[in-house]
């Protein structure tokens, strides 16, 4: 068991301590999983995280401290569980904040773990390096 004394630091509230304890208990009962088929393991983890209510911690209602506690706890028990959680958030984060009504229809499914979010990007000079993307505006005739 890892040292949890940091949860008593003044910037953690009781809700953070409750979250950490509840997730720790969930992890003990559900993790680690068999990684022999990584694709199946990821699908199963997303479904289990959704069924456990852990994917509800997303979008505008999620504070950074809660996000850190969730990711640290999942990663300590099973790195693939942290990956599955992070990818659901990365894939739907922009949709939860800025998505169209049609795009937002996917939020309940991804939070329930019945749909898997995706995040894809390619840029000529950065490939899949999100931090290296850039936007250039060029004035064109007629627009």
Regions found by a protein language model. Give the residues of each.
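Intrinsic disorder at enzyme termini
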Residues: 1-21
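Glycine-rich, Trp-frequent "lid" loop and neighboring beta-strands that shape
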Residues: 101-143
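N-terminal glycine-rich anion-binding loops that anchor highly charged ligand groups
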Residues: 17-19, 26, 49-50
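Short loop/turn motifs at secondary-structure junctions and domain boundaries
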Residues: 2-3, 38, 126-129
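Internal helix-loop-helix
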Residues: 50-114
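N-terminal capping segment at the start of a domain
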Residues: 24-33
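Electropositive phosphate-/nucleotide-binding environments in soluble metabolic enzymes
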Residues: 13, 17, 39, 43, ...
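Gly/Pro-rich turn-and-neighbor structural signature
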Residues: 35-51
